[in-house]
Amino acid sequence: MIGIIGAMEEEVAILKDKLTDMNEISVAHVKFYRGKLNSKEVVLTQSGIGKVNAAISTTLIIEKFNPKLIINTGSAGALDESLSVGDMLISNDVVYHDVDATAFGYKLGQIPQMPLEFKSDQELLKSVETVINKKNYNAKIGQIVSGDSFIGSVDQRLTIKRQFPEAMAVEMEATAIAQTCHQFHVPFIVTRAVSDLANGKADISFEEFLGEAAKSSSSIVESLIKVL
């Protein structure tokens, strides 16, 4: 069983439409769609936006369905200048950009008693690299940062990039999903398509390109599942 999590309806609708033998299961406020995708058993859910929603849905999917791995799919704002709208980014690791316990000796972004970076499963990364090379996806592998804010100004973007110079993209759920997977010892990977450049026009770009970003991210998830 493979778990797939997206935050928004647009980010899961394409995959949901391609499920066969689908059953809908509701747990608390969350709906799960269990079926087959490319002949593989999967369970798909729309978590809702933000870190708490993501953590709740990840906990439920792990406890209820016991997936062997979790894929987080969706969109992100680019922080790295090499990324353009429509490009794909795969997580090497994920970090919170809105956590600060430095007063107690922790690094910026580090939850107390947790690692600073939550690293993607290396075998999953190898599988993704195989897919990228075979399908010629315009994709890069790098760090993704998460926080409970939509980054829609140049000042916000520059602040995050200054504090987390390795960060290539920013979004609102991935690190919460990764932390939950870390706690439950479940491998994870994040696939995000760039929907905006996290600048003063980010809100307009996001609305315009979310659909295309969802198509791109869903496509790489489908291709990845084929080789798992």
Curated annotation (Swiss-Prot):
EC top class named in words: hydrolase
An example Gene Ontology CC term for this record: cytosol
Gene: mtnN
GO molecular function per UniProt: adenosylhomocysteine nucleosidase activity; methylthioadenosine nucleosidase activity
Alphabetized Pfam families for the sequence: PNP_UDP_1
Organism from which the protein derives: Staphylococcus haemolyticus (strain JCSC1435)
Domain of life: Bacteria
EC number(s) per entry: 3.2.2.9
Annotated substrate binding sites: G77, I151, M172, E173
Chemical reaction(s) catalysed: S-adenosyl-L-homocysteine + H2O = S-(5-deoxy-D-ribos-5-yl)-L-homocysteine + adenine; S-methyl-5'-thioadenosine + H2O = 5-(methylsulfanyl)-D-ribose + adenine; 5'-deoxyadenosine + H2O = 5-deoxy-D-ribose + adenine
Active site: E11 (proton acceptor), D196 (proton donor)
Pathway in which the depicted protein is active: Amino-acid biosynthesis; L-methionine biosynthesis via salvage pathway; S-methyl-5-thio-alpha-D-ribose 1-phosphate from S-methyl-5'-thioadenosine (hydrolase route): step 1/2
Keyword Hydrolase: yes
Protein name per the record: 5'-methylthioadenosine/S-adenosylhomocysteine nucleosidase
UniProt keyword Amino-acid biosynthesis present: yes
Free-text function comment from the UniProt entry: Catalyzes the irreversible cleavage of the glycosidic bond in both 5'-methylthioadenosine (MTA) and S-adenosylhomocysteine (SAH/AdoHcy) to adenine and the corresponding thioribose, 5'-methylthioribose and S-ribosylhomocysteine, respectively. Also cleaves 5'-deoxyadenosine, a toxic by-product of radical S-adenosylmethionine (SAM) enzymes, into 5-deoxyribose and adenine.
Family affiliation: Belongs to the PNP/UDP phosphorylase family. MtnN subfamily.
Keywords: Amino-acid biosynthesis, Hydrolase, Methionine biosynthesis
Biological process annotations from GO: L-methionine salvage from methylthioadenosine; L-methionine salvage from S-adenosylmethionine; nucleoside catabolic process
